[in-house]
Amino acid sequence: PSHKDDYAKLNKEWHAKEDQLESKIKETSAKTENLPYAATESVAWYLADDLKMTDATPKGYAQASANESEPTPADIKDFQDTLKAGPIKMLVFNSQEANSTTDQITGAAKDANVPIVELTEQMPKQYTNLLDWMSALVDQFAAAVK
């Protein structure tokens, strides 16, 4: 191809950023390994798994979220009580799906001094590529466990 050198350069830059991200994930996972977290949605599950975290989202709430249905009042209360009890060390909140239920959950997290990592399903406009966005998300997770 006529732009072979350009493509090779871009590929090399991409792989360098990818290696940096993998190193950052490995470094951060030393702090987050086995850390119990809960999530208003499973949007960050793969990243949390890469960070070796433990999903402690109460089962009823998690099932309702996975089925794209509303959690029952008992599920919401269980989530709030679990946040207050202390085993959850981080709440992951999908701000694109904010509603009165997630307001109750994030409110309980704030009351219990549980750090909240806010993220979205779509890459925010301030990022020009996936690797920069993912790197910023890893930074947010790392900052939440300091």
Language-model features: where?
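Extracytoplasmic metal-acquisition and chelation regions
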Residues: 1-146
